[in-house]
């Protein structure tokens, strides 16, 4: 073997090794001028490059190995953490473009992430995130940006979580929570924040519960609790606490009962007792006991009956028999029985009472917390008588 050392025009010191036939078989270079070889180039008998080794951290040992076929790079191996073990493998197509990249993310000498490329752009990544020898995460790309991620969270070889992206931003996530091959949870995102979540509660593939979020907190919940294909429960939240609940108490397909809460306790209830779409009974609570009722008995949306309770028992009832907003009769009760009756000459009620609203008006107020663009396609709610 013959060795020839020379300084190239670039100033780099190079050594050339030749066989007896005068063919170059190896080339060594000190590319940074520190007196140590950091680049090795090996040639085959035809004089074409067969392998290149590089010392990129200049510790005197190769960190990158590039293997050639027909003068073109075919495979590259990399030791990226200076432990002497290969942890990255790159494979090239006939054009010299990266076609596949494999990475050892666990330090056991085996690849756990496989990156596939096409036309200089990422096409798909496959990962074994748990190190169990099975791909449990697949990332798909479109135009160089993430378009979809599939995940196997249970480790049974079946993907159960699917995340969808637009322009690199998460917009939807679907989850098979029961691992039976059926999606039962859907999440919708804006600006990387969850704005709506839909749940299938009985396994028929259709959402039965919808949760709406603002700044990471639930503000509204809709539910088809009877699986009848229509919403029968709507709840509003503020700072994580339930403040209103509107529900179909009879299973008739009509929302008819409204509950209002403060600090977790029930303070008021309103009912549509005749199913005409308007509330006509209002019940007030203190310390979870009824203290007062108000009722509309003639459907004019105005209060004409006031009932008062003590220790949860009815003790007095005022009535507007002429429906003119004034009290004309008063009854006193004991143990559920009338014990005294008084005629009253157009007395003012003990306090002003607000008119009864329609069920739809209350629903609209609750839904106003959620912009129309963020709402789910509503499950039918029956309106009117």
Residue ranges of predicted features:
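Acidic, glycine-anchored loop motifs typical of Ca2+
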Residues: 10-11, 33-37, 58-62, 82-86, ...
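Thr-biased low-complexity repeat/linker tracts and other Thr-enriched repetitive architectures
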Residues: 105, 110-111, 121, 129, ...
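Ankyrin-repeat and related helical/solenoid repeat scaffolds used for protein-protein interactions
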Residues: 282-340
């Amino acid at each position: 073997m013959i060795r020839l050392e020379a300084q190239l025009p670039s100033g780099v010191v190079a050594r050339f090794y030749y066989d007896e036939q005068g063919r170059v078989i190896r080339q060594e270079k000190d590319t940074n001028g520190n007196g140590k070889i950091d680049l090795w180039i090996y040639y085959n008998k035809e004089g074409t490059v067969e392998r290149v080794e590089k010392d990129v951290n200049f510790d005197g040992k190769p960190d990158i190995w590039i293997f050639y076929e027909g003068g073109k790079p075919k495979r590259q191996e990399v030791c990226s953490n200076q432990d002497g073990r290969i942890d990255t493998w790159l494979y090239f197509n006939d054009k010299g473009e990266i076609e596949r990249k494999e990475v050892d993310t666990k330090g056991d000498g085996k690849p756990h992430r496989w990156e596939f490329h096409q036309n200089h752009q990422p096409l798909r990544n496959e990962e074994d995130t748990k190190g169990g020898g099975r791909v449990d995460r697949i990332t798909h790309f479109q135009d160089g940006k993430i378009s979809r991620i599939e995940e196997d969270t249970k480790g049974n070889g079946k993907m159960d979580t699917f995340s969808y992206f637009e322009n690199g931003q998460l917009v939807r996530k679907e989850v098979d929570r029961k691992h039976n091959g059926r999606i039962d949870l859907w999440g919708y995102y804006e600006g990387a924040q969850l704005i709506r979540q839909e749940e299938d509660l009985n396994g028929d593939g259709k959402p039965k519960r919808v949760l709406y979020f603002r700044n990471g907190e639930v503000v509204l919940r809709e539910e088809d609790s009877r699986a009848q294909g229509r919403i029968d429960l709507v709840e509003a939240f503020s700072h994580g606490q339930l403040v209103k609940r509107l529900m179909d108490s009879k299973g008739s397909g009509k929302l008819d009962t409204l509950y209002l809460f403060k600090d977790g306790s029930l303070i008021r209830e309103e009912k549509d007792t005749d199913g005409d779409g308007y509330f006509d009974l209002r019940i007030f609570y203190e310390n979870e006991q009824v203290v007062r009722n108000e009722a509309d008995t003639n459907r004019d949306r105005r209060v004409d009956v006031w009932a008062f309770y003590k220790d949860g028992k009815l003790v007095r009832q005022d009535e507007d028999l002429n429906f003119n907003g004034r009290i004309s009769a008063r009854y006193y009760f004991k143990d559920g029985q009338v014990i005294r009756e008084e005629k009253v000459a157009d007395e003012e009620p003990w306090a002003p009472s607000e008119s009864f609203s329609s069920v739809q008006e209350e629903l609209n107020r609750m839904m106003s917390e959620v912009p129309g663009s963020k709402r789910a396609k509503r499950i039918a709610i029956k309106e009117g008588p």
